[in-house]
Amino acid sequence: LAVGDYAYLVDAAGDIREAVAVLAFDAAKATIDLARGVLDTTPQSHASGTRLIGVGEWLAAEGAERAPGESVFVGAIPRTSTDQGDALLASNGQPLVLTGRQALPYPPGRIRLNGQAEPAVVAGDLTLAWAHRDRTQQTAYLVQQDAGDIGPEAGVSYTVRIRDRNDALVHTETGITGSSFIWDVASAADAGALGDHVTLEIVAERDGLESWQPQVRAVDRAGYGLRWGQHGGGV
């Protein structure tokens, strides 16, 4: 790996969780700096044992045309000038299900809740804002999460889903073409006391296709009747 390369964070099952960009190495401290959630991925939580796998410059292609939903086995066969080894199968030897990722719209970036990147608690109206992304334009370099607007891709809209602390869906807003959404106090009242902690999910959509990964943020809500024991009903 070198600075400027990208890599994947892969879980114990061999599934890709997140793409990251390599920003810097520190040999003395044995550390590596990464930019989270590049390309069509978003920042995820990762369990112990997650592996960082670099993406090299060696590529292979087959002539067969395949469709999303098909399953294939993928592997590499190590060879020398005189011999070859056993195939090294991807995904721990499990079949890979094709998803057609290359056609899916990129999720938005630069997520903000009431103007903040990662607030622990908000009060009053909840304003969710984001920056546009465009898979057709993001080809020259790895765009980081906090970058401003790129695009949007033609035909893209956004869907916001809000879940309460029991993970029940309490609101869905579709067809958003701008870069923000406000869940006002009156609308939020429908969630009742369970709305004191909400998870927000935002995806990009185009022609019936949804971004491969959503942007997800969780936050406490303070206000009248909400989180009195923690925030005194306010922030």
Regions found by a protein language model. Give the residues of each.
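Surface-exposed loop/edge segments in extracytoplasmic proteins
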Residues: D15-V20, R163-T174, S211-Q213
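Exposed beta-strand and adjacent loop surfaces of beta-rich binding modules
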Residues: G4-Y6, A19, D125, G155-T159, ...
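Recognizes extended acidic, P/S/T-rich segments that occur
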Residues: W58-A64, A140-G195
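Small/polar beta-strand repeat architecture
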Residues: G14-G93, T99
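Beta-strand-rich modules
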Residues: R66-D86, I182-P214
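Ser/Thr/Gly-rich low-complexity blocks that favor extended beta-strand/coil architectures
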Residues: L1-T31, Q145-D146, V203
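Pro/Thr/Ser/Gly-rich low-complexity, intrinsically disordered linker/stalk tracts
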Residues: A87-Y141, G208-G234
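Ser/Thr- and Asn-enriched, surface-exposed coil loops between beta-strands
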Residues: D26-D33, V122-G124, G175-F181
